[in-house]
């Protein structure tokens, strides 16, 4: 799997490719539009095409965004998720709050970037 980055100052867009075809994306963003928690930066927009899910692409993208945040001097990274709490927990993320966003129970999660990652084999 190859990763391609578009660096936009404090933000980064990553694209994962397999056999030359895009299979996933993820962003490092300075802020999230909603719901509103006053923290930064954010892992946002993680998406893997269905036929490449559960093959490790999501974990590779998350780890790459974590590395990008570390390189920019951040000690923590945040995200919102409605359905993938267990996935992120396997990667070392922790739920710190819940909010109701448009009728969905949404978890605010944090990753302490000074801590090593969780078991990568269980993350896929």
Task: Give the ranges of each region predicted by the language model.
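Short coil/loop residues immediately preceding or within conserved phosphate-binding loops
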Residues: 11, 38, 43, 104
């Amino acid at each position: 799997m190859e990763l391609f980055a578009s660096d936009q100052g404090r933000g980064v867009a990553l694209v994962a490719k397999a056999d030359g075809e895009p299979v996933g994306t993820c962003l490092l963003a300075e802020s999230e539009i909603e719901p509103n928690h006053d923290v930064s930066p954010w892992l946002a927009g993680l998406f893997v095409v269905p036929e490449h899910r559960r093959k490790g692409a999501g974990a590779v993208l998350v780890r790459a965004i974590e590395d990008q945040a570390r390189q920019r001097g951040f000690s923590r990274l945040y995200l919102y998720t409605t359905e993938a709490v267990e996935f992120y927990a396997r990667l070392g993320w922790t739920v710190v709050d819940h909010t109701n966003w448009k009728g969905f129970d949404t978890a605010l999660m944090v990753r302490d970037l000074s801590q090593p990652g969780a078991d990568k084999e269980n993350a896929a």
